Amino acid sequence: ENLLVQLAMENSARTGKPIDQRAIDNVAKEIQQEYYYKYDTSLNGLMKNYPDLIDSREFLRYVHNINYDVLEKDIELREELLRLNVKTYCATNGSKEHAINCMKKIGIDDLFEGKIMDIVDFNFKPKPNPKSLNLMCQKFQIPTNEETVYIEDICKNLSSDAAKDMIKVWFINDEPINNIDKYKDVIDYKIDNLALFLKKIRLLKEE
């Protein structure tokens, strides 16, 4: 769902503002970033370091309490998803509700109905933990080879062992957690327009 939000809004508006309201000093902000780098999500870091204090579901509700009105319908993206006529799924380290809220504003939620797995479904083991993607592939019978195109905005997530044989695509963005030099070898393609990328795939299939 991060990828979908980036199609229509600045990354900082996604989750940064709610977290900043609680991170009232620099130390808290530094801890937040440290946990993200070390544990793949801030929530995962909190759960590992303060298992008796953190309410994971309340945390998800809080950080996803954002203004979705900044998102707009993406008619082109919807059209290409429909015309491509392939199975599509969403794997998110956030909540399913957040992903659905984003998709509703963009106008593609019906195309992913029943095809979303979130951090709760992953037993709070965030991507790139291979257990998460393996769980999703097993549930939806997704091929773990070049038949599957795996698109991510966080290039680290493409390094998952579960995706090693998939076609891996990075949606270009300036998220500070992206270390492109470190993960460049796991990226097969880079894109900055999802609808255009899907259109190119469709045209290749039609040849």
Question: What residues fall within each predicted segment?
Answer:
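Glycine-centered loop/turn motif at secondary-structure junctions
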Residues: S12-P18, Y50-P51, N85, G107, ...
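A metal-dependent, Asp-based hydrolase signature
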Residues: V5, M9-N65
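Short, solvent-exposed polar/charged micro-motifs at secondary-structure junctions
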Residues: Y37-T41, V70, K199-L203
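Charged, low-complexity surface patches
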Residues: Y35-Y36, K73, T92, Y150
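Asp-based, Mg2+/Mn2+-dependent phosphohydrolase catalytic module
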Residues: L82, Y89, S95-K96, I100-E207
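Short, acidic loop-to-helix structural element flanking the phosphoryl-transfer center
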Residues: D40-C90, K96-I100, P130
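Conserved short-loop catalytic and cofactor-binding motifs
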Residues: E30-E34, N65-Y68, K87, V120-F124
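Asp-based phosphoryl-transfer active-site loop
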Residues: E1-N2
